[in-house]
From Swiss-Prot:
EC number: 2.3.1.181
Site (Lowers pKa of active site Cys): residue numbering on this chain: K165
A GO biological-process term: protein modification process
Assembly and oligomerization: Monomer.
InterPro entries xref list: aa-tRNA-synth_II/BPL/LPL, BPL_LPL_catalytic, LipM, Octanoyltrans_LipM/LipL
Presence of keyword Transferase: yes
Organism of derivation: Bacillus velezensis (strain DSM 23117 / BGSC 10A6 / LMG 26770 / FZB42) (Bacillus amyloliquefaciens subsp. plantarum)
UniProt key word Membrane: no
Function comment: Catalyzes the transfer of endogenously produced octanoic acid from octanoyl-acyl-carrier-protein onto the lipoyl domain of GcvH, an intermediate carrier during protein lipoylation.
Species lineage: Bacteria, Bacillati, Bacillota, Bacilli, Bacillales
Metabolic or biological pathway, per its Swiss-Prot or TrEMBL entry: Protein modification; protein lipoylation via endogenous pathway; protein N(6)-(lipoyl)lysine from octanoyl-[acyl-carrier-protein]
Record-annotated BPL/LPL catalytic domain positions: 33-248
Listed name of the protein: Octanoyltransferase LipM
Amino acid sequence: MEKETWRFIDSGNESPAFNMALDEALLYWHSQKKIPPVIRFYGWNPATLSVGYFQNIKKEINFDAVHKHGLGFVRRPTGGRGVLHDKELTYSVIVSEDHPEMPATVTEAYRVISEGILQGFRNLGLDANFAIPRTEKEKESLKNPRSSVCFDAPSWYELVVEGRKVAGSAQTRQKGVILQHGSILLDIDEDKLFDLFLYPSDRVRERMQRNFKNKAVAINALAPKRVTMDEARIAFKAGFEEGLNIHLEPYTLTSEELAFVNELAETKYASDEWNYKR
């Protein structure tokens, strides 16, 4: 069977506002049939705390710590919880809901898209699997997360290695298009991460941080030898091609497309109105 060709964009390290604006722009262009489906890789400059669309930042985020660590801050167009984007490869997938390979339900679409990430981990010699809830109680706990921290628990069809979460993803559907983006951790600074949230007491923070060590892990804590960012890019690009049975064709934005993204970044994702609205 002939492989479908998707676009591949590696946009490098960009500002938090630019990163979210480009994901939204790709979703919009795909909905207009201007571009085929897209896989995008990116990084962050500066390292950034992103929060989910629905998160209440006044109750959950410690902005003194965000500033102390020199981090950027942005609200995502997707749901989910707080993510520290630091030593990671971030990816996004943009594809129509009516694509013949895309299931109708959110969780099943997660599984299909995440096949690419699963293969990427395997390309790095890590035995990754999907975390599928086994009981009704586990299903319920996924619907009602107790923590503000995204990597605190594997959610439905998240990827785990040795029982610990290795990639966190969030999804939105707009204009008939699926946008899934997520983090693939190479390394993690747990103290910095846990500084960024508010807790009822120090004891609660200590307990959550202790539990976190048992639930989440970065690639370089597991890999037989250190994985560089370039090696991760190669492994996961090949992983998406294998997992989704596609061919990825590199693409560079035109000057007009870039201008559109920069304007969206400035007017929406860099604005206090968007970032601090709840």
